[in-house]
Amino acid sequence: MGQKIHPVGFRLGITHEHQSRWFAVPDRYPELLQEDYKLRQYIEQKLGRLAQNNAGISEVRIERKADQIDLEVRTARPGVVVGRGGQGIESLRTGLQGLLGSNRQIRINVVEVQRVDADAYLIAEYIAQQLERRVSFRRVVRQSIQRAQRAGVQGIKIQVSGRLNGAEIARTEWTREGRVPLHTLRADIDYSYCTAKTVYGILGIKVWVFKGEIIPGQEPDPLPPASRDRERDPRDRDREPRRRQQQRRRQQFEDRSNEG
């Protein structure tokens, strides 16, 4: 059933954590759960893909401590969230307090996403933006996979569903590179889903990213830098023997010149 169940929910408590971490009495639990939904919706409207200033929001984590709410916003563009002189955070905090209608203290911690091309939600968001601009889905998927491989992921799978390229009959196409072991619980798999609204209808984008295995008691291995992941051009390997021969000939010519 690893192919059917949600990859993140399947691994909660093993390789993934809950996005909302707090406890409440049963009477207040529905109210606080709705507050979390409103907070995430507000942040998505102000800084998400459809906002005027898209900050590339990847994830919003919420913690509650008495009358205090701690928000951790993971974004690809922290400068857009913070704003000039911190005005962006202050405006966001004021809007959230007005949304909740209370004087509870809200703390916002902005965390930059180190590997944008290895984040499943940001990849799905990028594909949705390109599809809404009527770019060929095959080209967008191929570019996203290449960028993810350069970012150091061990495997990636992308699925696009709907009226692809304006076809009369909807269909589903997917592409996979590397390993994506959905049955392995210790596998660190990032999953996300996004929709693209086109003139032909809504397209669904699903992205699975396999970043490696997390063994209990060991720290997860960081993704290697992009510079190390770039493969050498095979033509350079053919050029190396030629360069060595040219250097030897030059050295022999210089030795003969010195002897003369």
Swiss-Prot record:
Span list, region Disordered: 217-260
GO molecular function, one term: rRNA binding
Composition bias, Basic and acidic residues: 227-243, 251-260
Pfam families on file: KH_2, Ribosomal_S3_C
Family annotation (PANTHER family): 30S/40S RIBOSOMAL PROTEIN S3, SMALL RIBOSOMAL SUBUNIT PROTEIN US3C
Family: Belongs to the universal ribosomal protein uS3 family.
Summary of subunit composition and partner proteins: Part of the 30S ribosomal subunit. Forms a tight complex with proteins S10 and S14.
Name listed for the protein in its UniProt record: Small ribosomal subunit protein uS3
Organism from which the protein derives: Nostoc punctiforme (strain ATCC 29133 / PCC 73102)
